[in-house]
């Protein structure tokens, strides 16, 4: 049996793993080049309960997630005292992992193929003679054509993400600051790496230097050694 999953999101990666255990061939089709997925700086936040489920069903994933014990929320007006603090007693709030690490783990399975289709439409995919096609991607052309309203609103906003390498510290508290230009989040990946997500009212991706300037303005704990390339998320 051959099954096609549309989109390289977490839902499809988990579903693919379950299908592969049943000896079903799976293709994951998207508009992203597989080479880009190998090196992407995208990260995935997973709740404590969902991470337990993934560890039970995906071999090797237990070494990929980094635990976060608290989430602290700040405002631009008062950076020294948090507005809110979220924590779960005796358990982690969530786990953060690199999408590239999960992708590289999954692609080791010889029955799973990641395919980029330039002509991304249902007629082209049907010609590949799959027994079943599953679409769980929100913004691909097929979803927009068949499942969404024709009127689309452009809110002129973009989320910029990057990973910073920094001096080793105890790094298990996520922070988000609501600034005048938009919210910025510091999401721990390890004791020496942190994911940055900054959202603003723009349709143009920020360059590395511009994002670093924003980071430095609101960063009070990391001694940064390096910043990755910037990607958009959403």
Name what the model sees in each region:
Residues 4-8, 18-41:
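Glycine-rich FAD pyrophosphate-binding loop
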Residues 7, 30, 75, 164, ...:
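Short beta-strand/turn micro-motifs composed of small residues
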Residues 12-13:
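N-terminal Rossmann-fold NAD(P) dinucleotide-binding loop
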Residues 38-73:
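N-terminal FAD cofactor-binding segment of flavoenzymes
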Residues 48, 143-182, 190-194, 215-220, ...:
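Central beta-strand plus flanking loop segment that forms part of the substrate or channel wall
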Residues 56, 66-160:
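Conserved N-terminal helical subregion
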Residues 186:
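An acidic/histidine-cluster motif and surrounding catalytic segment
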Residues 204-234:
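FAD/FMN-dependent oxidoreductases across multiple families
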